[in-house]
C-alpha cells in the first residue's frame, strides 16, 4: 500500500511543479488520492479485524479441543481405575447382642476324585455365611473356579513367580494380604493391583476373629481397619470388598461386623495342608489333590508361601482350562442380598 501511495504523491508533485499544469486537474487528482488513501486504510482496518476474529476463533477452538482432550483423558483414566469404595453400614443391632460362639470353617471333600462333585459344608456354618452375604463357593452350577492366595508374609519370592505365571497364562487371581505383608512388600501389592488382580483384606495382625471379640468388639474392628489404612496409604484406594477371616475362624458377631465394614467374608470349598514351608507336599500329590477336587464354582484356597504350589501352578491352570473351566475373580459371584 505504501508503494502505491508514494507513486501517486510523485505524480502530484510533478504536476504541482509543472508551470503548464492545470490547477483544476491538480485539485481533482489530489482529492482522488486522498479518497484512495482513505479506502486503503478502511480495507486495512477490515483485514486486521477479520484476522483478529479468526485468531480468536482458532484460539477458542484450540482451547475447546484441549478441554475435550482433558475430559477424554480423565474419562479414560476413570474407566481404567474404577477404584473400589467400601460401603459401611450402620449396625442394625448391638454387636454385643450377637453370639460370639466360635466356628472353624470346614468343607467336606467329594467322595471320589475327578468326579466334579461339589464340596459340602456344615449346615450351621454355611447358613451363617449365607445370612451375612459371605462366600465359600459359587451358589450356581457354573463351570468357573476362583483361585485365592493368602499372603501373610513373603517366602522364597513365590508371589513374584505367581504373578509372572498369571500374566503368562492370561488369568486373574484373588489375593488376601495382611498389614505386615503390605509393609514388607508394597511393590508386590501394587503389582497385584496394576495387573488386574483382586486384593482383599486379611486383617492387620492375622488375628483370630472370635478371640479378638472376646477382648472387645473394637479390637477386631481395629485389626481390620488398620490394614485398610496401610493399604490406602500405599495405593490411594480401598480394598476390594472381600475379607478372609484368619484361620477360617468366625462367629455370627464377627460375620456381622465384617459385613457392616463393607466386606463379604470369603471362605473356600477347597484347601489342603500347604502352609508349612518346612513340610511341603510332593508336587505329584498336590497336583492330584487340587485338580482331582475341581468342581463348578470352586473357591480354591492356596498359600503363597508354598513352593510346591508355585512350581505346579502352570500345570494347575492348564488342567483347569483344559477341562473347560474359567478362572475368574470374586466380583463375579452374586450377592445374597
List where the protein language model places each region.
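Generic signature of intrinsically disordered, low-complexity segments enriched in small/polar residues
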Residues: 16-18, 23-26, 39, 98, ...
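Terminal accessory/targeting
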Residues: 1-145, 167-170, 296-337
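Short acidic/polar alpha-helix capping motifs at helix-coil junctions
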Residues: 95-100, 124-130, 149-156, 216-223, ...
